[in-house]
C-alpha cells in the first residue's frame, strides 16, 4: 500500500505508472535510473517524489495541447539525467472554437506555450540535464524543428513546424517539468474554401499577431471578428489567396502577405496596409 516511504530505484526495466502502482508510491520516491523505461499513460497520477537519474519517462501529448494527457503530480522532483519522451499524434485539427486543453494557431505562435508534464512542489537539478524526444525525434532545446500536419474539416491544409525545449518553470509561478514550444512556420497546402483558417480569439490576453512564416502554394482565410489580425512576418512567401471573411487584417511588415495571388476582402471586412508595402496578384 501507500505506507511505504522509501525509494523505489528502477534499473534495466520497464514500468507503468498505473493507478495501483501510483497508490503504492503515494508516500515514496520513484527513482528512474539507467535503462529503465517508465510510461505515464493517459491518466493523471500523484506520487510523493520523482527522481530522474538516467531512465526514460514517456508521456502522451503533443502540440497543440497545453498539458499531457496524463500529468504527474509530486511533492519533490529531482532533474538529474535521463530522457523525457513525448509521444502523441503528428497530425492535429485546426478547430474553431478551440476546445481545451488544445491551443489555437495564434496561441501556439506566442513563443511561451507550456505543455505541462509534471507538477511539483519543489524542484532540484536542471531541466537542461535531460534529453527531450518528440515523437521519436531527438530535440536540441530551441533549435530542432519538429514537423506535424494540420487538418481542417477532414482535409490536410498545412504542414506545421514547432520548436521545443524543456523548462522547470511555467512562467506563472508554477514549478515542475514543462515542454515549452512555439509555432515557427506553416506550409500552406490548400486554397479557396479549404484554405487554412486563422481566427482571432476574445480576451484581453489573446494573441492576434502571427509571426510564424507562411509559405507554400495554399492560402489563408481570416476571421478577425474577435479583434484585428496582424500578419507580421515579412519573409512570408505563400502564393495562394488571402481571404478576409470578417474583421480587419493588418499588414504588419512589408510583404507579409507573401506572394498572394488574390487579396479578397468580403463585404463588411477590411484590410489595413498600416504604412507598409505589399504586392498582390489581384484585388
Please identify what each model-predicted range represents.
Residues 1-76, 92-107, 128, 185, ...:
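Surface-exposed loop/turn positions within long extracellular repeat scaffolds
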Residues 42-175:
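Extracellular, surface-exposed repeat/solenoid domains
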Residues 82, 184, 219:
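Residue-level marker of positions within ordered structural domains that often coincide
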Residues 174-182:
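Short, structured interface segments
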Residues 176, 195, 207, 219:
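A residue-level signal for beta-strand positions that form part of recognition/binding surfaces
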Residues 184-199:
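Disulfide-bonded cysteine-rich modules in secreted/extracellular proteins
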Residues 220-225:
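Primary detection of the long, small/polar-rich alpha-helical "axial" segments characteristic
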